Amino acid sequence: VLENIQKDYVACYSFYKIAAESFKKAGKKKQIIDGLEKSADVTLKFNHDLGEVLGMPPQIMTKKTKKKIDEFTAIAKKDFSSLANQYGLMCKKLVENQKQRIDYWEAKGNKIIK
């Protein structure tokens, strides 16, 4: 469960950073960009906090994060809306209510065990 949540944080950090950069380039309102960057900061902090709990060295966390950013950047260049559709709502929920996502992974894990 914790490893899956940590992967979600990496994905959401990457999503928020790319979204903020895309919105900057598109000339969107500063308030929207600031919100995306704040969400990126929150997910990065939780990513690293959880990585430490899991015993993951900082250089490994950085490498995984960079890899995910590169992956999402490639997707966003082709079709940003598909990236937003896949991660936007999930990441918003993760930032607003972590317990909901933990419950999701626990339920999914329980289905596999049964």
Predicted regions and their residues:
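Short N-proximal segments of mature Sec-exported proteins
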Residues: 2-55
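Compact alpha-helical subdomains of small soluble proteins
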Residues: 35-114
